[in-house]
């Protein structure tokens, strides 16, 4: 499997979720299965089947997270030399040339992306258009909503 780029914070969040699933959620589900078994016939026991389904989802997510962490390439941008170029993990300030609207995005791994928080995936059209560019560069990016032009006003490594 190929390496999965993620920020230090993204790796921490996955580890926290993994710990919660293993130490809190898994025991809760096991208890729910045991309690449902006590209610008798398993063929028509909806509680039992629901708990088993939850167990499947939980175990699947545990495996998924362990796989991602096992293949993670954790990148600490704060330790990198700021040469002004947009790279993975950088926080980029942009001005939309058409609307004069200012936006700030941080380029993160796929699992960390959340556009409402200004976190965009390194594989998104905007991030792909920004990587390698510098402050004062103008970029034209083809997005699902059409062509958008931005001026890069800041690049920070936090």
Curated annotation (Swiss-Prot):
Any GO BP annotation: regulation of DNA-templated transcription elongation
InterPro entries hit by this protein: GreA/GreB_C_sf, TF_GreA/GreB_CS, Tscrpt_elong_fac_GreA, Tscrpt_elong_fac_GreA/B, Tscrpt_elong_fac_GreA/B_C, Tscrpt_elong_fac_GreA/B_fam, Tscrpt_elong_fac_GreA/B_N, Tscrpt_elong_fac_GreA/B_N_sf
GO function terms (MF aspect): DNA binding; RNA polymerase binding
SUPFAM superfamilies found in the cross-reference section: FKBP-like, GreA transcript cleavage protein, N-terminal domain
Signal peptide start and end residues: none
Protein keywords: DNA-binding, Transcription, Transcription regulation
Highest taxon in the source lineage: Bacteria
Keyword DNA-binding: yes
Database matches in PANTHER family: TRANSCRIPTION ELONGATION FACTOR GREA
Cross-referenced HAMAP family: GreA_GreB (MF_00105)
Family, per entry: Belongs to the GreA/GreB family.
Role played: Necessary for efficient RNA polymerase transcription elongation past template-encoded arresting sites. The arresting sites in DNA have the property of trapping a certain fraction of elongating RNA polymerases that pass through, resulting in locked ternary complexes. Cleavage of the nascent transcript by cleavage factors such as GreA or GreB allows the resumption of elongation from the new 3'terminus. GreA releases sequences of 2 to 3 nucleotides.
Protein name: Transcription elongation factor GreA
Gene that encodes it: greA
């Amino acid at each position: 499997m190929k390496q999965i780029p993620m920020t230090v914070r993204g790796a921490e969040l996955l580890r926290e979720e993994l710990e919660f699933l293993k130490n809190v959620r898994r025991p809760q589900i096991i208890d729910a299965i045991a309690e449902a078994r006590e209610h008798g016939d398993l063929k028509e026991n909806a509680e039992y089947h629901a708990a088993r389904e939850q167990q499947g989802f939980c175990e699947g997510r545990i495996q998924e997270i362990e796989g991602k962490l096992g293949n993670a390439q954790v990148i600490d941008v704060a330790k990198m030399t700021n040469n002004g170029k947009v790279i993975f993990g950088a926080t980029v300030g942009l001005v939309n040339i058409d609307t004069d609207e200012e936006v700030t995005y941080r380029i993160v791994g796929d699992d960390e992306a959340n556009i409402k928080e200004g976190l965009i995936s390194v594989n998104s059209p905007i991030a792909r258009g920004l990587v390698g560019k510098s402050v004062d560069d103008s970029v034209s990016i083809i997005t699902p909503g059409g062509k958008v032009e931005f001026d890069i006003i800041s690049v920070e490594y936090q």
